[in-house]
């Protein structure tokens, strides 16, 4: 028999789209962090969730076309980490260009500027990189405005590299 906490956590996960990324703090309104952690670990063991990183979980998304589960969205994982640590993040470099559709190059490292510390996370073949910037550089602007500001800087570097300048 499920406890009230377990049932509420599971209902929230069931109500989310496949591929949704969760962190422990997403359930702070339901239970304390230890109870949440135990419940998320249990749901991982039964296959309802997939652990991406310590404290970061995904409701797996299955592709009928590929006949397998698809990889976690790195941008969604970055946003979940930012949510968990109360960081403000903005994609930069090739990540910004890709998210705006200005580059078709597959980025090897998903890069973000952040008001948090310099930090790198890796899982499977995916790497997230957070670069510290002062609050004034990234706070107070909408996500899209910040993204648009970051993209031209990256685009200029990309074009210079392509033309050999």
Predicted regions and their residues:
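Single conserved hydrophobic/aromatic residue that forms the stacking wall/gate
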Residues: 157-164
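Short gly/ser-rich loop at a beta-strand->alpha-helix junction or flexible surface loop bordering the NTP-binding
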Residues: 52-55, 82-123
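Basic, helix-initiating cap at the start of DNA-binding domains
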Residues: 1-3
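Short, hydrophobic/amphipathic alpha-helical patches that form generic packing surfaces
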Residues: 95-98, 143-155
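Short beta-edge/loop segments at beta->alpha junctions of small alpha/beta modules
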Residues: 5-9, 14-80
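Protein-protein interaction interfaces in oligomeric scaffolds
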Residues: 135-138
């Amino acid at each position: 028999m499920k406890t009230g906490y377990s049932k509420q956590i599971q209902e929230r996960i069931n109500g989310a789209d496949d591929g949704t990324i969760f962190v422990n703090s997403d359930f702070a309104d339901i239970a304390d962090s230890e109870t949440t952690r135990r419940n998320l670990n249990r749901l991982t063991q039964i296959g309802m969730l997939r652990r991406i990183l310590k404290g970061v979980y995904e409701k797996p998304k299955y592709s009928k076309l590929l006949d397998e589960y698809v990889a976690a969205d790195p941008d969604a994982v970055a946003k979940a980490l930012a949510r968990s640590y109360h960081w403000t993040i903005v994609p930069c470099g090739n990540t910004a260009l890709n998210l705006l559709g200005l580059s078709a190059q597959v980025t090897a490292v998903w890069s973000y500027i952040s008001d948090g510390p310099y930090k790198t996370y890796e899982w499977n073949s995916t790497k997230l990189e957070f670069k510290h910037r002062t609050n004034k550089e990234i706070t107070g602007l909408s996500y899209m405005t910040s993204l648009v500001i970051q993209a031209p800087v990256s685009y200029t570097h990309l074009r210079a590299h392509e033309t050999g300048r």
